[in-house]
Amino acid sequence: MDDDVFPRPDCLEQLLAYAGYEGVGILAPRRLLEGRIYTNDFLSFNLTRPFSSMYSGRLSKMEVNSPVEISGTAFEGLFVRGEVVRLVGLPNKDLFIFCDDTDYCLRTVAAGYKILYVPTALMDKEKFFSDDSWGKRNKKKKWKRFYQIRNSSYLNHHYGKNWAVKYLRGFNGVIGYILIAFFSAPFSGAYRWTDIPMFWKAYTDGIRERLGRL
């Protein structure tokens, strides 16, 4: 569980109510940010269409009032069965900061287990950088961008079902950050032009599956 989420008193009780459901390997709670539903959980993985997100059927676009089977959730209070850990193993520690949860969900679903989102199991999520400007917020988070680009490029390369997903999806992502850095560097303290080769290295490390913490 991340240190920026706080379970409600009955959160675990609500999760455990579904622990006996057949085939369920992971139970995921509902997170609330300032009292509003906050979710990046999704229904399925897109591993074939390179110009669409890897994450299909986002719950953020749906009204969910009862437990629903999903394919991906965050490492923020999820409940994992012991047999899943014994079969699938531990999360990949080399996927530092980003995508370790997505990778683990992929492996869990591939092993034949279900992931269940339980909307009555509530956790409160803390909001960071709420009063910062765009430049200040991105400057604080910039050190994470390398891992975000690299790890997402790795996921697409490792699990993608065709050449386009393996290479183009990650390329599209890194080009976006390169363009932001190129055009904002003269006017904002968020990025510098020297960040551009770092972003490119993140992409190439990802498709070469070079992981680990720098």
Per-segment meaning from a language model:
Residues 2-6:
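The conserved acidic donor/metal-binding loop of glycosyltransferases
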Residues 9-43:
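Conserved donor NDP-sugar-binding/catalytic core segment of glycosyltransferases
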Residues 10, 14, 103-107, 151-154, ...:
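Alpha-helical elements of Rossmann-like donor-binding domains used by nucleotide-donor carbohydrate transfer enzymes
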Residues 60-80, 102:
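A recurrent flexible, glycine/aromatic-enriched loop bordering the glycosyltransferase active site
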Residues 78, 84-89, 94-122:
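A short, conserved alpha-helix in the catalytic core of glycosyltransferases
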Residues 118-137:
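Active-site donor/metal-binding and catalytic loop motifs
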Residues 161-214:
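Non-catalytic, C-terminal membrane-associated alpha-helical segments of glycosyltransferases
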